[in-house]
Amino acid sequence: GDECGLYIVRNGVVAYDNIKLTATANEDGSITWQPDAETKLMGGLSNENYFLYYPYQTDMNGKVDASANEPDDFFATLISGWQPAADQSTYASYAASDLMIADGTTTKGTNGTLSLSFTMSHAMALAVIKMPTIVYQFTNANVKIPDYVNKATAADFTNSDLQPYGIAPGTYRYIVNPVNGTAKNITGKYAAGSKEFAFTPNITNASSYKTYKVDGAATIKKAHTLQPGDYLLSDGSLIGKDKTLTDGQKAACVAIVFYAGHHTSDGSDYPETGIGQSKCHGYAVAVDDAIPHPSRGAMWGVNGGSVGTKSNGYSEPETDWNGYKWTQKIIDAAGGVGKLNATTQEGYPATYYAVVAHEANCKAPAGSSGWFLPSIGQMYYLYENRTSWLYGQVKITIYGNYWTSTEYFTNDAVTMLFGDYGQSHYEKAWRFGVHSVLAF
């Protein structure tokens, strides 16, 4: 658990010096801080002060003032010399930079025990970075597509002296020392690298925050003709297929658009996903296989019973674009996402790889449906129209025989062969490739 340091001061003299306390969670959600079993604490005298700080430091020599009565004064040297990490991009480094302090009050318990209560306050200050929202207004002449609102605009801090922590889509945080500040800048780019920003996060009051709104955190409207071959980045940004990508954009590309608009044969309902409405804006295919070569191959699921994804898609592929809907039915048959697994038929391995494993390797944009196992109609369309999306600036890994989410019989599910074209069906215990798609 988390660790903090405790001081007990009697008559201006430190009686207990930097005692390590470790947090344990209680059933009611509260937290109890306990010393190790060998450490016995005695207190409760009228002339005692109790001070706590977090996170624990092994070297506290010369960093406290035993004559002080308030935590700000007691820990003044610790606070002034505290150096928040330059790289706070992970939660661990962000939390380790957030110095907190407290003084304690005592409550007498049974059998002569004494409980200490602390209310922690932040000794540092917080810079909050808000990114703009980009609204893609689609200009397609042949299909009407509603605006695509990307609230998760990501910043690229690759070359920044200071690296903030992404607390939520489009929002970042950085811990700053209010006593001595920083002379370094937070610099970044967004909008696929086309826009830049910079600021120095100096905040003078402890336990306070300042919001930095990049370009006013405004809503930026952007005209875009959505077409197969467009690039969908990890933050939900779209880049047209005719634009030249930077190396950073290539690395951030998670999927390629293969269809613009909501297909009329898609009976999926998307309001509970990141899309937030019934109909999607388009569909995109993952850059990489869900099961890497050469170990590729997963069972579809349980033989001898339908999960409800059979359709006319085998003979009429264009009528079945229900990949997301079918994937949810398979998940229900497994007993929930947590019951999917890679090894047993009851765990529906193909769906596990499409939904769980691929998400672990390549996070879907926040404003999307999330990854799912495509239906036969979606896989058929991908194959038939591969020249429109397959040969762009980002290399796509897709070759071989792939499962779809569409059933054929109770024992069989439909596959699509990329390379030498072939649409077929096999028993669900057979092992084939898995390639994820998403709607956005």
Model-inferred region functions:
Residues 51-53, 126-130, 175, 284-286, ...:
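Residues within well-ordered beta-strands of beta-sheet-rich folds
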